[in-house]
Amino acid sequence: GECMKRKTIDIITLGCSKNLVDSEHLMRQLEEVGFHVTHDAERPKGQIAVINTCGFIGDAKEESINMILEFAQAKEEGSLEKLYVMGCLSERYLKELAVEIPQVDKFYGKFNWRELLQDLGKAYHDELHIERTLTTPKHYAYLKISEGCDRKCSYCAIPIITGRHVSRPMEEILDEVKYLVARGVKEFQVIAQELTYYGVDLYKKQMLPELVERISDIPGVEWIRLHYAYPAHFPTDLFRVMRERDNVCKYMDIALQHISDNMLQKMRRHVTKGETYKLIEQFREEVPGIHLRTTLMVGHPGETEADFEELKEFVCKVRFDRMGAFAYSEEEGTYAAAEYEDSIPQEVKQARLDELMSIQQGISGELSAEKVGRQMKVIIDRLEGEYYIGRTEFDSPEVDPEVLIERGDKALHIGNFYHVEIVNSDDFDLFGRII
């Protein structure tokens, strides 16, 4: 018979790295059953498109909806045969979206995307469940160890979208690490909605320290970096693991949200100002050289000027190595939406956000300047114009500072580690030369 041309499927991923991991698993499955798969096309390239959406806060939802509408239009114009939508937005608003955007052939939630294979007339290959088609540079990968969150923070819709915390079995995670190492991955960004809860459901205790140790034992794992920890009931055994293991980056991404007891209580964070300061002190004492990344929130209902002053003082005092901040966005279905009035005007929220970030910008600049003259181990991510661009163990991809190294006579290899002397810095990035 006539040779069937392989159909191309575009996968478009919006939102966080946890979503990206789902897309990578789906891509591997689609390739296995004979499709040609592309990732993150700006506009439809293939015959079929799958959009993996984000449902986090206002802006992210808008971005997802705009992307769906753009592809829906392409379908109407005949340049796209099939359009499928999955992920957090459709998990949350499945019925509404189906009514609003009828051009979409089918909406899947966050967990039932495997059905897409059947709907395309193919089978889901269960034996490949740890395999992925990486969309990141091939020397690093995100490693998702659990899904969902049992915390009940006032403002957060993530538990509504993702459901209860479900840890992946440790052996399965370790198999995935070995699979990725065999394909050249050296650096693992360990991610979850909430890392510190890992293991409680499966093993009846917090198992993050043990999991990290076991990943650290696997030959070929050069860097392990931890993302999204929760401050209450922190598994302090992790300090020892970070201190003892060379391949565990001295880096912790821990969202603290606020510092005033009034706000922490209203946010239902189950932690106090005193405990927060103590945890930071413990981190710095127990893990010399640790770099802390945090995320803070301004404008949550009930935040007074005094609360905000306390938050600014906190940022000045602690001098976080990395910091992000959000203005409160009311999310339907959350405790805050039901119980509190979203009373702080948008312009006040924005002003507080700007003020906090500008304080941090100064601190970041000073901390970067302190690195000048130091020798650091750097992994090279890419070549851009006149610079090789890399990161130290204190920098996670996409969000953190980078190290820029001028192209010299000697070509550097993407994905290799080099010893670099830091020769200069600006508010954000470092400039280095190969030693």
Whereabouts are the PLM-identified features?
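Proteins enriched for Cys/Gly/acidic motifs involved in redox and nucleic-acid/cofactor modification
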Residues: 2-198, 237, 252, 275-285, ...
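Conserved SAM/AdoMet-binding glycine-rich loop
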Residues: 81-87, 92, 97, 102, ...
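Glycine-centered loop/turn positions within well-structured domains
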Residues: 114, 151, 196, 261-262, ...
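Conserved, mostly hydrophobic/aromatic
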Residues: 173, 190, 226, 254, ...
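Active-site proximal loops enriched in glycine and acidic residues that flank catalytic Cys/His/Asp
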Residues: 192, 228, 256-258, 294-298, ...
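Terminal RNA-binding accessory module
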Residues: 336-435
